From Swiss-Prot:
<dbReference type="InterPro" id="IPR018130">
    <property type="entry name" value="Ribosomal_uS2_CS"/>
</dbReference>
<dbReference type="GO" id="GO:0006412">
    <property type="term" value="P:translation"/>
</dbReference>
<dbReference type="InterPro" id="IPR005706">
    <property type="entry name" value="Ribosomal_uS2_bac/mit/plastid"/>
</dbReference>
<dbReference type="InterPro" id="IPR001865">
    <property type="entry name" value="Ribosomal_uS2"/>
</dbReference>
<dbReference type="GO" id="GO:0022627">
    <property type="term" value="C:cytosolic small ribosomal subunit"/>
</dbReference>
<dbReference type="InterPro" id="IPR023591">
    <property type="entry name" value="Ribosomal_uS2_flav_dom_sf"/>
</dbReference>
<keyword id="KW-0687">Ribonucleoprotein</keyword>
<comment type="similarity">
    <text>Belongs to the universal ribosomal protein uS2 family.</text>
</comment>
<dbReference type="Pfam" id="PF00318">
    <property type="entry name" value="Ribosomal_S2"/>
</dbReference>
<keyword id="KW-0689">Ribosomal protein</keyword>
<protein>
    <recommendedName>
        <fullName>Small ribosomal subunit protein uS2</fullName>
    </recommendedName>
</protein>
<dbReference type="GO" id="GO:0003735">
    <property type="term" value="F:structural constituent of ribosome"/>
</dbReference>
Length: 242
């Protein structure tokens, strides 16, 4: 499993919170103090809490669970997509559509439409259409890909959400809470930690910090999945030997 040291976190700026006037008092237990009117996060709390979160993500991955990475603000967009691809999981990195989890039935229909359009674009159907109609379908496909591309192969609700900014993604967290889906989230000093099962107190704005969280999560998930494949193969081999 990926190990992230306090030094790694300091170098990535994980300890820098938001301006003190924007703080959420519920984050007080995780704040070390303030410097130049900016809250400083207590990394002695963050390191073990991040380890717990990574252990949990690993255990979900080892049971073939589906992990949904959520990060729709600009600092996270590309990194979220890369991390999810790296560990063969799922992601939402543009606008969170209300009902993405709680109205899965409708989302599933949109995913089906996206896959139909993708098939049409490959099998020559678009070429038989008028230019205008082909353009309309291409635009529809691109729009659906942007919002649903990261979950089109999820095949049902996720087993856990890994969220980059609890404040920015509060709708996603609320939907997960309503469905009893566990939430692992980076929670900055301006955010409400309620509804987050595995709180990771940390900077949710600095790109280096965001990449640190995502890389560690992706590595942990990947390792757990690979370990599960090895164990499975050994068990299968053991069964065959009898």
């Amino acid at each position: 499993m990926a190990k992230v040291s306090m030094r790694d976190m300091l170098q990535a700026g994980v300890h820098f919170g938001h301006q003190t006037r924007f703080w959420n008092p519920k984050m007080k237990p995780f704040i070390f103090g303030a410097r130049n009117n900016v809250h400083i996060i207590n990394l002695e709390k963050t390191v073990p809490m991040f380890d717990d979160a990574l252990n949990y993500l690993s255990s979900v991955a080892s049971k073939k669970g589906k992990i949904l990475f959520v990060g729709t603000k600009r600092a996270a967009t590309e990194a979220v997509k890369e991390a999810a691809a790296n560990c063969e999981q799922f992601y939402v990195n543009h606008r969170w559509l209300g009902g993405m989890l709680t109205n899965w039935k409708t989302v599933r229909q949109s995913i089906k439409r996206l896959k139909d359009l993708e098939a049409q674009s490959l099998d020559g159907t678009f070429e038989k259409l008028t230019k205008k109609e082909a353009l309309m379908r291409t635009r529809e496909m691109e729009k659906l890909e942007k919002s649903l591309g990261g979950i089109k192969d999820m095949g049902g609700l996720p087993d856990v959400l890994f969220v980059i900014d609890a404040d920015h993604e509060h709708i996603a967290i609320k939907e997960a809470n309503n469905l009893g889906i566990p939430v692992v989230s980076i929670v900055d000093t301006n955010s409400n930690p309620d509804g987050v099962d595995y709180i990771i107190p940390g900077n949710d704005d600095a790109i280096r910090a965001v990449q640190l969280y995502l890389n560690a999560a992706a590595d942990s998930i990947k390792t757990a999945r690979e370990l599960d494949i090895v164990v499975q193969a050994e068990q299968d081999g053991f069964v065959e030997a009898n």
